[in-house]
Amino acid sequence: MANLLVSTFIFSALLLISTATAATFEILNQCSYTVWAAASPGGGRRLDAGQSWRLDVAAGTKMARIWGRTNCNFDSSGRGRCQTGDCSGGLQCTGWGQPPNTLAEYALNQFNNLDFYDISLVDGFNIPMEFSPTSSNCHRILCTADINGQCPNVLRAPGGCNNPCTVFQTNQYCCTNGQGSCSDTEYSRFFKQRCPDAYSYPQDDPTSTFTCTNTNYRVVFCPRSRLGATGSHQLPIKMVTEEN
């Protein structure tokens, strides 16, 4: 009897695990320039214009993010630097990127088996982005404004636009003193007015977090739907002469 109960428990546990299916992410570069895609977890991949990268992510993955790096130069061993989004000088990222970089963030199979996903500008902005579930029943997030071109002078950075937290490093902008310790500012409103669905500061949750279930996802750099048929967008501020 005891063995039967144990076997039933193990079978039930395995069944629950199997129902929490993994998700596939298609990462597509529709920019007119090369983007070095990065993912944590996942690593990194050079994407020339029109190229894509398929990433299979395990069920239950959380605190995950995908971003694009610009103006990179890597040697044959995958060591080098990027102007924006650099992750410790490696093509294959094992940690998070250096601001400024537009982020697609997600956590799979969380509360009530829901996926949580968002676009965040808390680390600033470098590339316009779409983050969308393949399910038509869930919300498509877009951040395609010309933030680099309109960036306030104090937030400007080579190749992108910093979030004020990166520049000032105070609770007013970083919310380091906990929930309710900060609110929107003139700088967060600059981002929010241009990308209403994206996080503009760390406690911008109510209008910036979305949920879906049982779906795969697409992350698109320079999505064409809002940029015209060619998918053109202002190039990063400084382009390297040799791309690896």
UniProtKB/Swiss-Prot annotation:
Pfam families: Thaumatin (PF00314). InterPro entries: Osmotin/thaumatin-like_sf, Thaumatin, Thaumatin_CS. GO terms for biological process: defense response to fungus. Disulfide bonds join C31-C222, C72-C82, C87-C93, C138-C212, C143-C195, C151-C161, C165-C174, C175-C182. Keywords: Disulfide bond, Signal. Residues 1-22 form the signal peptide. GO terms for cellular component: secretory vesicle. The keyword Disulfide bond applies. Belongs to the thaumatin family. This is Osmotin-like protein OSM34. It comes from Arabidopsis thaliana.
